[in-house]
Amino acid sequence: MKAAVVVANEDVQYQEIEEPQAKPGWVKIKIKASGICGSDVPRVLNHGVHFYPIVLGHEFSGDVVEVGEGVTKVKVGDRVSGAPLLPCMKCDDCQNGNFSLCKHYSFIGSRQQGSNADYVVIPEQNAIPFDPSISYEQGAMFEPSTVALHGLLQNDYQGGRCVAILGCGTIGIFTMQWAKIFGSKKVVVFDISEERLDLAMRMGADAVINTTKENYMEEAMAITGGKGYEYVFETAGQVPTMHMAFELAANKAHVCFIGTPHADLTFTPKQWENMNRKEFKLTGSWMSYSSPFPGKEWDLTAHYFATGQLKFDPGFIYRKMPMSQAQEAFQLYKTPGLVKGKILLTNED
């Protein structure tokens, strides 16, 4: 089969590799769409892979073409997405249902062959069937949707509250949608891109705020009557938005860092004191899994995509490119700010 193989730093080659087979308990999927995740970019451009050669890709969808012995959950012909985590299922964290925290895990697309290929194989339990009314493009967005929902579930999310979403990338837009689905009073999305903020409004945000404006904080607080936001979800992983989260939080709020920082993070004593004075809870969120594995995050994504309450917009996708152009796709990320949205690598029939 053909695959986009990372053979060296900044070197992705579309080449022939051995085609995997479905062993007992596993399924083989013909890949239709595979998204480039932000975590894949440093793997290709900054020596971030675990080993060479490696096939990346962990946000994907396709059709089941082969099932191994004993498989009962899915059948040949099913349209599926895939949960990429392969937890050990034996450690204390796994036994307690905290699969994201497993220290002995493997992972499709970083520690073993991923979905930037004609085919990928995954355990039966990692295959998430979805309704044929859901497109393959949507199916490739299951993983970022589940990351967003996991953040809400980590914070005992309740409706009827004001919610701030910091960052208007794919995960930020999904976080906004989940907050709306579960009954928020008002959801406000913050970003520096008018294009992305327009997308957030189309997708259902109650208000959007461009943080490059001089008086954006006054505008943000006025929406809540000066009380601040009961839930603040930081999805950008940027130092300014992490500072902003502390300032936007209401008394007794829940502040959740979903975004992963890539620079040193420092707070002034005054900034940090917000947490003391407001007595808010600061929580991290990692990946997207719960018990029973892979978790309600995945089941609910399939359900709400099928009902149409979880929405998809062409604006999610920056560009669709053939799998054979993976090298060119990753090169686009070298221009700061160029890629707005998801790049999907697709296979021709």
Predicted regions and their residues:
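C-terminal hydrophobic helical "lid"/dimerization subdomain
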Residues: A3, H243-E247, K296-D349
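Short Gly/Pro-enriched turn/cap motifs at secondary-structure boundaries
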Residues: V7, E18-E19, F51-G57, I108-Q112, ...
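Glycine-rich beta-strand-centered segment in the early N-terminal region that forms part
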Residues: P20-S34, H47-D92, D131-I134
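NAD(P)H dinucleotide-binding glycine-rich loop of Rossmann-like/cofactor-binding domains
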Residues: C88-L166
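Mid-domain Rossmann-like dinucleotide-binding core that forms the NAD(H)/NADP(H) cofactor-binding site
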Residues: I134-E214, E218
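Glycine-rich cofactor phosphate-binding loops and adjacent beta1-alpha1 units
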Residues: N155, M203-K281, L338
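C-terminal substrate-binding/catalytic core of Rossmann-like NAD(P)-dependent dehydrogenases/reductases
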Residues: M221-A222, G226, L265-I317, E328
